[in-house]
Amino acid sequence: MSQEPRLTKKDFASDQEVRWCPGCGDYAILSAAQSVFAELGVPRERFVVVSGIGCSSRFPYYTNAYGFHTIHGRAPAVATGIKIANPELSVWIVTGDGDSLSIGGNHLIHLLRRNLDVNVMLFDNRIYGLTKGQYSPTSEVGKKTKSTPFGSLDRPFNPLALALGAGATFVARSIDVHAPHLKETLKAAHAHAGTSFVQIYQNCNIFNDGAYAALRDKATRPDHALELRQGEPLIFGRNRDRGIRASGCHRPEVVQLGGEV
């Protein structure tokens, strides 16, 4: 009996020229996803990458698998049809903060509510990059952009809170340059039977450079990021001396460990 050939990262690299800006965080996410796809044990012909409109949505062109570059915000609807038509497929939605949370917000929440076995990768750079720098649904209050020259008045969405409110059964957050964590997260998303929602912090070095500087920099990341693991205490910091506990109002607060804490 012949065995399926073992896939490698190169098997998922297409022959298309990758046309993101030099230094864009999308390169790191693409590299991580290609590596993960090769390790999942799924035949290449069963992968489908579906995207909407935006910089991140060029993903299907750069992945050597089946792909569908859809219209603005409609990737969840198309992915739903694909998964229903052939449940054996491994369906991955690639979208951005504008594509999924603005024009595509309605489609996203109903995808999460239905809980089909698909995976969502939301590239969140807090800006509209493809259209040259307008504020997005995740831009912070006061953000000055081409569309908000005096600063944004709108409060940003918290994508994970939105996903949980819509009934998501798997939510996670990672960052473009932390390859080990991102790969582990994508593997866990694939293993989940239901809709997996992964928010990925991604740097747009042209129109919103440094949006996640404290998390991307290896020197400062330990003091600003906490990796959640089942059954393990919420401890972080370069010296593992900071933690999170519930306050009297059951709200999380950061505390310095040691002494009476």
Where are the regions a protein language model picked out?
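ATP/pyrophosphate-binding catalytic subdomain of soluble kinases
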Residues: 169-227, 231
